[in-house]
Amino acid sequence: MVYTILGEEIFKRGIDKYFELFDGQAVTCEDFIYAMECVSARDFSLFKNWYKTNGTPTVKCEVSNYNEDDGDFVKIKISQFNAKNSNILMIPLKIAIFDANGNPIQMENNQNEKIILLDEKEKEFIFEKKDNKLLAIIDNAVINEVNKNKFISKENMIFSVNRGFSAPVNLDYGLSFESKKILAKKDSDFYNKYNYFKEIILENMLQDVLEDKIDNSLNMAKFIEEVILNYSVDDLSLVYFLRLPTFDDLSEKFIENLPVKRIFEVIKKYETKIAVVLKNKLIELYSYHIDNPDVFSPVNMQKRTLRTKIIYYLAKLENEKNIIEKHYFDTSNITNKIAVLNAIRDIMDVDFYKYFMDDFYNNYRDYHLLIDKWMALNSTTTRDEQSALINVKMIMETSYFNIKNPNNVRALIGGFANNNFCIHGESFEGYSFLFDMIEKLDKINSSVASGIVKTFAKFKTLKKDNKAYIKNHLEKLLENKNLSLAVFEITDKILNN
């Protein structure tokens, strides 16, 4: 934030001053700020409040516009609030402004971005617009001449606020759905672009979860396609726009009656729709970004990440099995092979899935870390409610699983414990199995056992019957007089939280 407030040149001078004054000494954050004050002649008293403020402040933005014969004006009112502390903070906010079509509106000196400083509880910034450009922020004398009562809320200008995460704050900015879409497509700042993209997808998926008759998956797949088409084919950052909200992202929105099965249905529906709508684009990207498995470099890592995500989507399509097979067998890179196993673990063609899983096991059964990954893949399938538990019980009977080996347990039983689709199934068999394992493991390794207990940390958000079953078994755990302290403390905390 200090860099953002001062700019590169003054900040570098501040760093030089800092070493001049304090090199070789035991220093504090305040000493660092003092060096910056020396070279900038700026008072950082309010900035120091960051070092003694708990919680994350919320910055609220309200935008309004009005027109007069002598000019157009746009006002943004920004206020700060922190429920845990009343300290006023110095908050630098990078902003840019776009019109209703997503075109950037230039400000003074032909810049597309400006830094405004919120150093009061509430502050207003008024811009004057001429010739489709926003001039400098009007000074206080002119503001007094502006009739503030004429400002009305309109969205012919869209503010992109806190660009580049210029300040660690929560932003309360009531943008409309359409304005968010414009920023997700056209904003040149990756941080805000991706954040609004995530918000849009999450809002639509959540709507689908809550309303069985609503299906936004096709519209969202087309929206993702529009966002991706704005990227050049060689821009590897577009992989972020192929990532959907996870079960954890969606479940956080519920405080009770968590619809586990419905959430997974919606996720799978969106994944399939994206694969269908973006099929040609995905294949184009996959063919373009060939990674070199023998060269370790950031670029090759990014390419593998992108191709891994593409393989995951293509596995949803029945007629793209050749690409999946080629991706697996034409590489010696384990990351690529595991990407295929991860992509196909939930498909309904069990024979196709088993073909690759058997091949991986037969080739790498002497490599314990790889077999741990293989176990985890078996225990995390969400093909149906029973498959994962059947896999786990079967593997536990084999010679390559050792319940006294923590890595084996974390991979197989820990993997199943994180398989929300299966453990929260209607039969409650997953719960029963895990509670049996907790008691058994507690006698062998209480640390591992307590980790599995944490699976039930949010059980109070589940539906009534699920909650009752889990609560009953957690209470039974506490009645066990031989229970380890580690498991007892975690269990007691979960029950009484």
What function would you assign to each model-found segment?
Residues 1-5:
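Acidic, glycine-rich low-complexity/disordered segments
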Residues 8-12, 16-355, 368-373, 386-388, ...:
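Non-catalytic accessory/interaction domains
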Residues 357, 375-376, 380:
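Eukaryote-skewed repeat-based solenoidal scaffolds used as protein-protein interaction platforms
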